[in-house]
Amino acid sequence: MVEPNISSYLQNQLKQAQELEENIEKIATQRYQLDLSLKEIEKTLQELNKIDDKTPVYRSIGSILYKVDDKKKLIDELEEQLELTKIRINTLDKQQKSLEEKYKELQAAIRERYNQDNKKGAVS
């Protein structure tokens, strides 16, 4: 809860800090979902590489399963999806790091300004 005697500047800074926290949390959630997807793709590729080329392979689209005629094409698609997922994870990591740095800077600025305002209030 915001104290009523905090300056509007500090209130604005606190609001920005809360927004940064929310964005960091959203990115962490997206990162987690991509990690799950990455593991699933890797596991699928491992299993596909274990089986014989003559073994029938099925792919799930929603609630429908259909037979895959070209296992090699499916593996290529999954490997491409794997690479794209890794790129997205890397991008999210960079975004999260940047937001965390901004958050730390903002935290320091808020703390400094709050201390300055309190000193002024103590002198008055």
From Swiss-Prot:
It is found in: Cytoplasm. One of its GO terms (biological process) is protein folding. GO terms for molecular function: unfolded protein binding. Its main location: cytoplasm. SUPFAM superfamilies: Prefoldin. The keyword Cytoplasm applies. CDD domains: Prefoldin_beta_GimC. One of its GO terms (cellular component) is cytoplasm. InterPro entries: PFD_beta-like, PfdB, Prefoldin. Keywords: Chaperone, Cytoplasm. It comes from the Archaea. Heterohexamer of two alpha and four beta subunits. Molecular chaperone capable of stabilizing a range of proteins. Seems to fulfill an ATP-independent, HSP70-like function in archaeal de novo protein folding. Belongs to the prefoldin subunit beta family. HAMAP family: PfdB. This is Prefoldin subunit beta.
